[in-house]
C-alpha cells in the first residue's frame, strides 16, 4: 500500500504471529510503504479501542511522510485476547519487540496515547536500541497527579464499565475522553460497544486491569525510570484531560532529560482526535517528516 493509494481498513490490514510465552497473533495496519522512515502508532486502552479507530484522523496524513504501522495492542482490536498475562505494558512491549523482529525493523520512533504511551515508554526502556523519538499523548505510567484527585474521573468510568459493561456506561466513559462532546456520536458509541462487549474483549479488559495489581506491577510505574531515556521525547497533553490530568505531566517533564511539553487548550484526553490537524503537523515536524 503506497502513500498515494486510498487507505481503507481492509487494504491496510495485516496480521503477524509473535511469541510471548506462546504464540500471539497481532493485527496492525500498514500504510506509506516505500517511505524511508517507519513510525509505529500505539492506541489507548479504553473499551473498544483499536488502532484504526483511535488514529483514523492521523494514519493517512502521516503516511504521506512515513511508513506507518498502527498496531492493535494485545487484547484489543483484532489482536489475540488472553485471559492472563503479566504487567500489561511489559507484555505489550514484548509483543511489539516480536513484531519488530519479524518485520526486520531497527530503531523506530513510537507514537502512543494513554495506555499506548505507556507501552511505548516500556518498550524504549526495555529495548533502548530499538526505540527512536517518542511522541506521548497523555501517557499512562508517567502521569503522577500532583493536584488532581486519584483515581481520576476517566479511571472511575473505565472501572464502572468493567463491572457493568453496558452501552450507557461506555458512552459515559467516552464523553470523559473529550472536551467537545459532539465528537461522541451514536455511531462511534455503537462501533466501540460492538468491539468492547464481546466475551473475549471483556475478559481481556479485566486481565489488563488486573495486571496493574500483579506481582510485577512496578513495571508500570515508569515515572521512576524515565530518567534513563536518551532520545528526544515530545509530551502532548490536553488541558482538559480528565483521565491523566495536565498536572501529571510535570514529573515526566522534569525527569526525562530531553523532554518537551505541548499543551492544547479546549482539548481532552484524545489529542490526536480533537486537535488532529495540529497534532499531525506537530508530530511530522518532531519526527523529521516536515523537512
Curated annotation (Swiss-Prot):
Alphabetical list of Pfam families matching this protein: Abhydrolase_1
Catalysed reactions listed for this entry: (1E,2Z)-3-hydroxy-5,9,17-trioxo-4,5:9,10-disecoandrosta-1(10),2-dien-4-oate + H2O = 3-[(3aS,4S,7aS)-7a-methyl-1,5-dioxo-octahydro-1H-inden-4-yl]propanoate + (2Z,4Z)-2-hydroxyhexa-2,4-dienoate + H(+); 2,6-dioxo-6-phenylhexa-3-enoate + H2O = 2-oxopent-4-enoate + benzoate + H(+)
Residues the entry annotates as binding substrate: 45-46, 54, 113, 115, 192, 270
GO biological process: biological process involved in interaction with host; lipid catabolic process; steroid biosynthetic process
Resulting phenotype, residue 114 to A: Reduces the hydrolase activity
InterPro entries for this protein: AB_hydrolase_1, AB_hydrolase_fold, HsaD
One Gene Ontology cellular component annotation held by this UniProt entry: peptidoglycan-based cell wall
Family: Belongs to the AB hydrolase superfamily. HsaD family.
PANTHER family named among the record's database cross-references: ALPHA/BETA-HYDROLASES SUPERFAMILY PROTEIN (PTHR46438), LIPASE-RELATED (PTHR46438:SF11)
Task performed by this protein: Catalyzes the hydrolysis of a carbon-carbon bond in 4,5: 9,10-diseco-3-hydroxy-5,9,17-trioxoandrosta-1(10),2-diene-4-oate (4,9-DSHA) to yield 9,17-dioxo-1,2,3,4,10,19-hexanorandrostan-5-oate (DOHNAA) and 2-hydroxy-hexa-2,4-dienoate (HHD). Is also able to catalyze the hydrolysis of 2-hydroxy-6-oxo-6-phenylhexa-2,4-dienoic acid (HOPDA) and the synthetic analog 8-(2-chlorophenyl)-2-hydroxy-5-methyl-6-oxoocta-2,4-dienoic acid (HOPODA).
Name this polypeptide is given: 4,5:9,10-diseco-3-hydroxy-5,9,17-trioxoandrosta-1(10),2-diene-4-oate hydrolase
Gene this chain is encoded by: hsaD
Amino acid at each position: 500500500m503506497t502513500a498515494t493509494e486510498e487507505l481503507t481498513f481492509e487494504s491496510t490490514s495485516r496480521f503477524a504471529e509473535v511469541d510471548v510465552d506462546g504464540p500471539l497473533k497481532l493485527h496492525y495496519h500498514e500504510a506509506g510503504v516505500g517511505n524511508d522512515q517507519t513510525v509505529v502508532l500505539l492506541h489507548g486502552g479504553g473499551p473498544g479501542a483499536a488502532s484504526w479507530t483511535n488514529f483514523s484522523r492521523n494514519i493517512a496524513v502521516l503516511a504521506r511522510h512515513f511508513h506507518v504501522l498502527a498496531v492493535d495492542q494485545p487484547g484489543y482490536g483484532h489482536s489475540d485476547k488472553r485471559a492472563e498475562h503479566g504487567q500489561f505494558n511489559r507484555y505489550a512491549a514484548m509483543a511489539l519487540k516480536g513484531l519488530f523482529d519479524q518485520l526486520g525493523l531497527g530503531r523506530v520512533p513510537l507514537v502512543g496515547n494513554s495506555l499506548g504511551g505507556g507501552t511505548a515508554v516500556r518498550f524504549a526502556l526495555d529495548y533502548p536500541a530499538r526505540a527512536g523519538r517518542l511522541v506521548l499523548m497523555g501517557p499512562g505510567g508517567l502521569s503522577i497527579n500532583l493536584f488532581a484527585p486519584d483515581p481520576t474521573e476517566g479511571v472511575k468510568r473505565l472501572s464502572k464499565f468493567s463491572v457493568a459493561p453496558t452501552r450507557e456506561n461506555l458512552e459515559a466513559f467516552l464523553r470523559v475522553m473529550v472536551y467537545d462532546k459532539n465528537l461522541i456520536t451514536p455511531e462511534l458509541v455503537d462501533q466501540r460497544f460492538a468491539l468492547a462487549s464481546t466475551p473475549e474483549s471483556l475478559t481481556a479488559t479485566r486481565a489488563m486491569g488486573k495486571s496493574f495489581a500483579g506481582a510485577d506491577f512496578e513495571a508500570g510505574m515508569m515515572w521512576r525510570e524515565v530518567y534513563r531515556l536518551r532520545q528526544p521525547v515530545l509530551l502532548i497533553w490536553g488541558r482538559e484531560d480528565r483521565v491523566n490530568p495536565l498536572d501529571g505531566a510535570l514529573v515526566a517533564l522534569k525527569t526525562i532529560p530531553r523532554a518537551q511539553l505541548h499543551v492544547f487548550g479546549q482539548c481532552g484526553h484524545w489529542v490526536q482526535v480533537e486537535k488532529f490537524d495540529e497534532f499531525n503537523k506537530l508530530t511530522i515536524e518532531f519526527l523529521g517528516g516536515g523537512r
